Amino acid sequence: MSTAGKVIKCRAAVLWEKNKPFSIEEVEVAPPKAYEVRIKIVATGICRSDDHVVNGSIITPLPAILGHEAGGIVESIGEGVTTVKPGDKVIPLFVPQCGKCRACKHPESNLCTHGDLGRAQGTLMDGTSRFTCKGKPIHHFLGVTTFSEYTVVSEISVTKIDAASPLEKVCLIGCGFSTGYGSAVKVGKVARGSICACVWSGRVGLSAIIGCKAAGAARIIAVDINKDKFAKAKELGATECVNPQDYDKPIYEVLQEMTDGGVDFSFEVIGRLDTKVSALMCCQESHGVSVIVGVPPNAQSLTIDPKVLLSGRSWKGAVFGGYKGKDDVPKLVADFMAKKFPLEPLITNVFPLAKINEGFDLLRAGKSIRTVLTF
């Protein structure tokens, strides 16, 4: 029996308060309004940005259903939707693409002015929620909200992908993989034969390593305090691995000595302020490019000597690897299907939604690269 136009009751992981576990609840998901799409989520990844909300370092209205990296199937569409139809495989886009605003029209920008990123309203574009639980409205997250069996998104926040693609794998393209891979090939524009350093070797850092390798870097140095990650980093393309705890000097000095003055490209992936400065300092002073990838804590600022940049270093940043969601995500899925890069090595656990708290525990303990939740 068709569910189009009807309220759907389903399971979702609700975060009622910060620093509390997720609670599996029955929620009601309203049908999509005009220019909205209701999606049955098949698989969703647990991202460190979700945990930043749990611990309060990223602020968004609560209670909320988090999750922003997923793959699913369109269940129904609202009036006026033309880019997807029921039955399509899709990836929700936490960085939307309306195609009409100034940012969308600029070839080097991917931050649509209609996105919830940075505003954290916790609603869809009309200022309301499609979720209720126990009679209370539940907030959305980044306009996508994927820790739920069903979700509703704006049409500008979803893109159709290859019908043959495995959603439990390509869901990673919805955030972490694209963020790391794009930071190397699209934002940093790693040059063939160059020397690169990836500061931190979690899932996004490993994706940056994959990107550096794809771009033809001659040396790729993985930096992490967890030596257990080094084997995977080398499997995916790192030529050397460095643990800062093995040295009695700043890690940027170690990297400068290893590379005759500094790397050509560096990628800071963890989001710590001190590692952002180290990643910049380890670059070659006349031409090195450092890309900020990791999400920094709220309400904190960096202090650096301007002469560090005056000599010729460049400091760049981008969200979602600089990719325009509707334009680029289907291409990335096609590239995965053509075996141009792997996703399987990044997935360490596949859990049902009921084990979401176990997945977050593994993330916090540094014992997983990516945990995928299935419904």
From Swiss-Prot:
GO cellular component: cytosol
UniProt remark on cofactor binding: Binds 2 Zn(2+) ions per subunit.
UniProt cofactor(s): Zn(2+)
Residues binding Zn(2+) 1, per UniProt: 47, 68, 175
Reactions this protein catalyses: a primary alcohol + NAD(+) = an aldehyde + NADH + H(+); a secondary alcohol + NAD(+) = a ketone + NADH + H(+)
Its EC number(s): 1.1.1.1
Enzyme superclass (EC): oxidoreductase
Predominant location: cytoplasm
Cell compartment(s), UniProt: Cytoplasm
Transmembrane domains' residue ranges: none
GO function term, MF aspect, one: all-trans-retinol dehydrogenase (NAD+) activity
Keyword terms, alphabetized: Acetylation, Cytoplasm, Metal-binding, NAD, Oxidoreductase, Zinc
Family under the similarity heading: Belongs to the zinc-containing alcohol dehydrogenase family. Class-I subfamily.
Subunit relationships: Homodimer.
Protein name, UniProt field: Alcohol dehydrogenase 1
Upper classification of the organism: Eukaryota, Metazoa, Chordata, Craniata, Vertebrata
Gene designation per UniProt: ADH1
